[in-house]
Amino acid sequence: QTYLKEVKKTSISIDKTQNKVIEGNQNNLIQNLKYEVRLDQENQYIITSDLSEITYENDIEIVKMQKVTAIFIDGKNIPLTITSDKAIYNNSNYNTNFSDNIQIEYLNNVILSDKMDLDFNNNVINIFGNVQYDGIQGSVKTDNIKINLITKKIDIYMDKDKNNVEIITKK
């Protein structure tokens, strides 16, 4: 008698690469950590750091990163590159809070700020704290820039209504 058994293969893809684990702490310290996340068919998010500490809050992996580079690639394959001194990355929803010396580059545009939140739950980027934008058309100083990742709509506004956004055009 011959019995046939159907075997199903399950493929598991690991998103994070790590080069060196530093011992001696209850939390895991990792050098050169990299996460690659395919958000959907068209959008990809890659984040790397020189040094990271992995902790767990309510069974969710939270990664405190130092010397961070993140790249968000949309359907048009145009990268939005973010660098910062620090970031906190949530591995369950990929939301990332960047802080200290943030530089955002997209096409020929550069934004500098103190803080930035990349919120995939609401598909929005919030840039705040000493925001300075420099592009081909000119430069802007403001308190906040909000970018909708779906519609690409950009809101530029101040914390207080009595303050004005400063715009300098290039001629």
Regions found by a protein language model. Give the residues of each.
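Mature-chain termini and adjacent capping regions
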Residues: 1-171
